[in-house]
Amino acid sequence: LSSGYLLLEDISDDRCYEAWYAKTSPRLEALGIEVSHAISDRAKALIKLAVTGFECDSGADLFHAQQDLSRWLGPKLARQAATAEKQAIVAQTTEEKAPETATEAEQHDLKEQSLKARKDYDQAKQVQATYHENLQGISDAIHPFSLIDNSPNDAEKVEEGLENRAKAFEHLAGEQDISDKKDVMKKFRNQIKPLAVSVSFWWMWVSETLQGLAVDKDLEDWLTTTLLPVVYWHRQLHLTQNSRSREHYRKAWTQASHILNAHPFSATLPDSDIQRWLTWAEWMVRQFHRSSSAVEGRNGCLAQLYHNGRGLTPQRLRAL
């Protein structure tokens, strides 16, 4: 939940749909909670739990979508860069330690080899940078507002951005002669719509909330295009631990803050109304989710056990 509260924690080696539903349904019913949107790692049982059990949209988890691409390309590109670096060092050392008896032609060849090795290494590092840029681009695309101009995003824009990243990864893999034996790109493309639905669902929630509050058109426009971006990027800025993301969020927040301060409508509202809508906006941005909790599930369990230096019981091993 947005509060950080866990609905249910249970150790089980049975992860079929029936097991999930049997455990979650009574808990949700007891709390009076109805699920409207469920994000998961795309396990078939969890997709069925959302669509059949909860009768809601099933969203994809951003972390797992990026992780699949990272496992496919990251290690291979890192090895290529490491190999190119070693070859560049060897070539440079060979050139520097060339014997005085070496002919001018031999010295020229050694210099050419060193330059070529250095060029290959620079190219390998550039390929890595392109890979990281596109991996970051997946995260940058899945926000309710554009990082460029703070305009509202919709599912169509998100899908377009993710498809562009998919094409970039395919081009990169082709250039580096990296095969896709496990159909990683097919799996990623199958997740594009479920990733984008998080944005469209959130905007639907915003719209329904404002309709319930019976706000007029001017106030609605100010809230959705001016106030919400400021509050949203401020929250993201303090949530992320990624330095690159933090810099992007800081720029977006600064830009949105300038627009808010300069907007004529901002000056017409009394302080009490502004505080009221700030409270609403803070609540609203906490409802946007694009990944499952980092402290839940199998990965969270393993990370916690590793951090605490604890062992794995036979029951936990079966569940994992």
Label the model's feature ranges.
Residues 1-38, 43-56, 60-62, 72-79, ...:
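RNase H-like nuclease fold core
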Residues 8-13, 34-38, 283-290, 308-312:
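Conserved aromatic-histidine-acidic binding/catalytic patches
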Residues 23-27, 184, 301:
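Short, hydrophobic/aromatic alpha-helical segments in well-folded domains
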Residues 44, 67, 299:
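Short, glycine/acidic-enriched loop or turn micro-motifs at the edges of active sites
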Residues 53-92, 237, 244-295:
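Helix-centered, glycine/charged polyanion-binding patches within enzymatic domains
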Residues 128, 152-155, 159, 192, ...:
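Amphipathic, non-membrane alpha-helical segments in soluble helical-bundle scaffolds
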Residues 137-281:
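Long, low-complexity, polar/charged, intrinsically disordered or flexibly structured peripheral segments
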Residues 287-317:
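Short amphipathic alpha-helical "interface-anchor" segments enriched in bulky aromatics
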